[in-house]
Design a protein with these regions (language model features):
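Non-catalytic structural scaffold of enzyme domains
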Residues: 1-177
């Protein structure tokens, strides 16, 4: 919230953006629910346990989206990249625009980088596992990823530091990646 207010400074209160924040910290683990819903299996879920995990996360995300819709929001932004694994199912069930963050990053990249360029993707292991960026980037760019050591020593630690609000320390740790 602070960052949103800082980036959209107003001279008076009425100039600040109106937004609603729904933060559900106890949502079931997204990374543990990934890999259970693949196109390779004709969109069939692998087994009942995997289906339950997938549906628990979907149900939790839907609850948040429905609450925002009831609050008369005009669109929804999901800041968790990994949660975009459930984007298509959310979109089908919520009659409200949901900003697709990986697609927006791709559109921005199209404006800034030549096609067929190598683009580094620094993300959580869950986001990498979902392939939510690959479906946009694979045909136009060469996505490159940190190796296992850099992922664990730099990227994962930097992401945790950002979540804790220590961006300065995260900037130092991410440099090797």
């Amino acid at each position: 919230c602070n960052k949103l207010a800082i980036l959209n400074r107003g001279k008076i209160d009425q100039e600040y953006p109106l937004f609603l924040l729904y933060n559900k910290a106890n949502i079931p683990g997204r990374p543990e629910s990934i890999g259970v819903h693949t196109k390779n299996l004709s969109n069939r879920l692998i087994n009942n346990q995997s289906k339950k995990k997938y549906n628990l996360v979907l149900k939790s995300l839907l609850k948040g989206c429905q609450l925002l819709k009831k609050s008369k929001c005009k669109f929804i932004v999901v800041p968790c990249n990994t949660a975009h694994y459930w984007y298509e199912d959310l979109k089908k069930k919520i009659r409200l625009p949901i900003i697709n963050m990986p697609k927006e990053v791709f559109n921005h990249t199209l404006k800034k980088c030549k096609k067929n360029s190598s683009i580094g993707l620094l993300a959580t292991e869950g986001t990498l596992k979902t392939g939510v960026y690959n479906k946009f980037f694979d045909k136009k760019y060469n996505l490159i990823y940190p190796n296992y050591i850099l992922q664990n020593k730099s990227v994962n630690k930097a992401i945790k530091l950002v979540k804790m609000g220590d961006v300065k320390a995260a900037n130092k740790i991410i440099k090797p990646a």
